[in-house]
Amino acid sequence: MENNTIPKHNTFYAIGLNYKKADAEIRGKFSIDAQSKSNLLQQAKTEGIESLIVTSTCNRTEIYGFAQHPFQLIKLLCENSKGTVEDFQKVAYVYKNQEAISHLFKVGTGLDSQILGDFEIISQIKIAFTESKALDLANSFMERLVNSVIQASKRIKTDTDISSGATSVSFASVQYIMKNVANIGEKNILLFGTGKIGRNTCENLVKHSKNEHITLINRTKDKAEKLAGKLNLIVKDYADLHIELQKADVLVVATGAQNPTIDKAILNLKKPLLILDLSIPKNVNSDVNELENVTLVHLDDLSQITDETLEKRKLHIPAAEAIIEEIKNEFSSWMNGRKYAPTIHALKAKLNTIKEKELIFQRKKLSNFDEEQAELISNRIIQKITNHFANHLKDEETMVDESIDYINKIFQL
């Protein structure tokens, strides 16, 4: 019997770490850049992993995929990042099957975000799936699951107010700057790096600070020019960084590098400087704290800022969870259908074989054998039997795997 469902000896796992137990330094070790992700996917393919997706953001690094043992996925993560198995064991989590599915739904719908209702992660999940599919590393289960999570995310965003109000890491950054820097509209603000959080922060700064002294610097100048063009900002060459740092009152770092891009040595300051490091791994060396006139604030500090908006969002968690449960149940029904469909087809084929043998026997035995009537009655009986089995397997109370095993044994499928 052909089996087009999940391989029996493979389990669906979610492995990873996030802001809840892993601090910025540890998350930095396990962060995966574009090249490392490409290497990881290629290695997974070489090692016979059937299907997986990889996400790495400021707040979490996770792998969702099929394996005989979770260590296969943990090994992939550690070998393609600066993290170790020992570090992983201290702060990470491993979920399997239904728990792994539930975790992906919570992550993708913003319920597990560092700032509740922040939907940025869903775009990362979409990208991760597209990258895996391009390498034939996304089976039908993964495709259906990711699409279900996207559907839940859209429904929650549309049907609840869990993402209402301007609350995100980028908005928290702007709130912090506005509260802690007097006369912000007259200050020199320097954005170094144009990562997504940096771009969003820049847009929020322009909108809320009414500041016309925002300068962008990026290693790749055309990216900075593209953003500056939209917002009517100043762009400077990377070579001018040290000069612009001396002019700045506020520095927002969003370079997304694997090592610090700002340290004590580069800061030759003549006035106080507020630095916001919005990067994982940290892109500002902690040695800048040795300078008297520097205030360093990291992404994790900003994420702890709570306000009325977040408290209001919490009221919508039950409604969001109800939507997740509904779509998860639809996914489970589809998954069970995928499991038992081959068994029902095989059962029907087996009953038809039994029928044909019996009809041959009756033709020889009876001189007035009614072929048409016998076919009609037999087919109706077979359909009724298979329907009974199908309805049993569809029942929520049924232990599907166990029932399939019994059917296979009884009918020798």
Curated annotation (Swiss-Prot):
Its EC number is 1.2.1.70. Pfam families: GlutR_dimer, GlutR_N, Shikimate_DH. The active site is at 58 (nucleophile). Signal peptide: none annotated. Belongs to the glutamyl-tRNA reductase family. Possesses an unusual extended V-shaped dimeric structure with each monomer consisting of three distinct domains arranged along a curved 'spinal' alpha-helix. The N-terminal catalytic domain specifically recognizes the glutamate moiety of the substrate. The second domain is the NADPH-binding domain, and the third C-terminal domain is responsible for dimerization. This is Glutamyl-tRNA reductase. It comes from Flavobacterium psychrophilum (strain ATCC 49511 / DSM 21280 / CIP 103535 / JIP02/86). The gene is hemA.
